[in-house]
Amino acid sequence: MSEPMMWLLVRGVWETLAMTFVSGFFGFVIGLPVGVLLYVTRPGQIIANAKLYRTVSAIVNIFRSIPFIILLVWMIPFTRVIVGTSIGLQAAIVPLTVGAAPFIARMVENALLEIPTGLIEASRAMGATPMQIVRKVLLPEALPGLVNAATITLITLVGYSAMGGAVGAGGLGQIGYQYGYIGYNATVMNTVLVLLVILVYLIQFAGDRIVRAVTRK
């Protein structure tokens, strides 16, 4: 493998990491409050609102049901308006964020559902407001589950970023498609696959360590 190709792969790793973590961050900025809203408005919860819950849940389900490659193409006009282009690293972050947010929202809701209802009832009996319950009971108790959700999300985004590379998003996906598939270079294709596997392994390893660190003994 030539030196220019090696540097291209290094840049591809950097672009893949940037797409994954930046879109993961913005995905959580959107998905975390939506997930909390889904939980607290469920029937029987602290601010139960069946109509609001059904509406938000339906929107989340709609976006979750769209395959990412279709979402990527569908969002090209919106991406161009937001970042001024429909190709490249910055452009990829927009559909990646939109694709991740509803997934994160459901993961957050599921993590909160694991919390014993007795803790919430005790907090309500002590006069805690809904916001206090969310900040001081729900989120701290669900922290291991939230970290696990973040790990799964980041791993999913690694795969999404590779798909985005096939339509000019950059990263390892574009290198694998352009130089490996189109260029019939098996060495490049296999190297890209190995690098993606390593990235996934490292993210999972770090996530597992953090979960163990925040899990209360």
Swiss-Prot record:
Disulfide bonds listed in the record: none
Domain of life, source organism: Bacteria
Transmembrane segments: 20-40, 58-78, 81-101, 152-172, 186-206
Keywords: Amino-acid transport, Cell inner membrane, Cell membrane, Membrane, Transmembrane, Transmembrane helix, Transport
Gene Ontology MF annotations: ABC-type D-methionine transporter activity; L-methionine transmembrane transporter activity
InterPro entries associated with the record: AA_ABC_Transporter_Permease, MetI-like, MetI-like_sf
GO CC annotations on file: ATP-binding cassette (ABC) transporter complex, substrate-binding subunit-containing; membrane; methionine-importing ABC transporter complex; plasma membrane
Membrane topology: Multi-pass membrane protein
Pfam family, one: BPD_transp_1
Primary role: Part of the binding-protein-dependent transport system for D-methionine and the toxic methionine analog alpha-methyl-methionine. Probably responsible for the translocation of the substrate across the membrane. (Microbial infection) Probably transports the toxic C-terminal region of CdiA from E.coli strain MHI813 across the inner membrane to the cytoplasm, where CdiA has a toxic effect. Toxin transport is strain-specific, mutations in this gene do not confer resistance to several other tested CdiA toxins.
Family per record: Belongs to the binding-protein-dependent transport system permease family. CysTW subfamily.
Protein name, UniProt field: D-methionine transport system permease protein MetI
Organism (species): Escherichia coli (strain K12)
Lineage: Bacteria, Pseudomonadati, Pseudomonadota, Gammaproteobacteria, Enterobacterales
